[in-house]
Amino acid sequence: MRFTKDHEWVIVEGDVATVGITAYAAEQLGDVVFVETPEAGKVVKQGEGLAVVESVKAASDVYAPVSGEVIEGNGELAGAPETVNALPESGGWFAKIKLANPAELDALMDRDAYEAFLGTL
């Protein structure tokens, strides 16, 4: 698992990256009440808006940690947005992206680096 400073995570299997938000981000948002995930076929660049998550506190963009084509959005979140709070780093994923440039992963943090980053906030 790799992480961004915007609190997204990515897990790569082969050439497919599964993307979500971290437990820290979910905790900061509070109770998630709405999620808009991308549709298959959407092409995203690293750092661009990928999804939207709304909570009782705020609406936030979820940014693509990698570039590529969305092959699946997690449609189950529309009917069960609370999954983002309950399972932020597993079942609460937002999208699966076919990687365009695997080298982008090198710029992301591993868990130890991410936890050290959280310590600076």
Swiss-Prot record:
Note describing how the cofactor binds: Binds 1 lipoyl cofactor covalently.
Pfam families (UniProt xref): GCV_H
UniProt entry keywords in alphabetical sequence: Lipoyl
GO-annotated cellular components: cytoplasm; glycine cleavage complex
Record InterPro entries: 2-oxoA_DH_lipoyl-BS (IPR003016), Biotin_lipoyl (IPR000089), GCV_H (IPR002930), GCV_H/Fam206 (IPR033753), GCV_H_sub (IPR017453), Single_hybrid_motif (IPR011053)
Recorded family membership: Belongs to the GcvH family.
Protein name, entry field: Glycine cleavage system H protein
Organism phylogeny: Bacteria, Pseudomonadati, Pseudomonadota, Alphaproteobacteria, Caulobacterales
Gene: gcvH
